[in-house]
Amino acid sequence: MSKAGKKVKAQQHGHLADHVSVGETQIPKASTQHLLRKAGSLSAAGDTEVPIRGFVHMKLHKLVQKSLLAMQLAKRKTIMKSDVKKAAELMHLPVFAIPTKDSGAKGSVFLSCRQKGAGSAGTGSETNSQEVRSQMKSTCLIIPKERFRTMAKEISKKEGHDVHIAEAALDMLQVIVESCTVRLLEKALVITYSGKRTRVTSKDIETAFMLEHGPL
């Protein structure tokens, strides 16, 4: 995390912000902006990247934890797509179809691969922007796949398992995490508009999360 990122983290308080830790791989800033645009946001404060990163990491951590349990029950050393589906069922999360650039995913938030809306605050680094654009040339998914894979592997190692994650399982993990993130941001946008504002803030995102999950 950059010095600016650490400074923002230090200034922010909230359940999601607490899931952003120095030393752990995080999604690029450019990805947080694309997720906001996918949710319909036309403008966002610069501090929104922290709770978005926190939510992505938290949701992925819980999914990987339960996928590891399903894998162990099946007596395997590789996380398969079926393990991720089982994890999603245990978490009462919808399992979406894997989207492609041409088809999108019927029944999920990824109904269109076209990115609409004006840019959010901040541009991210040039490397991050290029990384995200490269990812979106072949899929509707927003977070760079190798970055997401690294995050998933770090979490599995943290849980004491150095396992292989099948490509289909990784895709399923990413679809579920990104879909849940976009839905959270859509709810945050409702809070923004109800306050007669147009600029989404980190507080809106944290509030949307608390309304959905209750006091933690």
Swiss-Prot record:
Residues 1-12 have a biased composition (Basic residues). One of its GO terms (cellular component) is host cell cytoplasm. Pfam families: Histone. Residues 1-23 are annotated as: Disordered. InterPro entries: Histone-fold (IPR009072), Histone_H2A/H2B/H3 (IPR007125), Histone_H3/CENP-A (IPR000164). Keywords: DNA condensation, Host cytoplasm, Host nucleus, Virion. It is found in: Host nucleus; Host cytoplasm; Virion. Signal peptide: none annotated. GO terms for molecular function: DNA binding; protein heterodimerization activity; structural constituent of chromatin. The keyword Cell cycle does not apply. One of its GO terms (biological process) is chromosome condensation. Gene3D superfamilies: Histone, subunit A (1.10.20.10). It comes from the Viruses. Histone-like protein that is recruited to viral factories during viral replication and participates in viral DNA packaging and virion production probably by forming unstable nucleosome-like particles. May compact the viral DNA. The N-terminus is similar to eukaryotic H4, whereas the C-terminus is similar to eukaryotic H3. This is Histone doublet H4-H3.
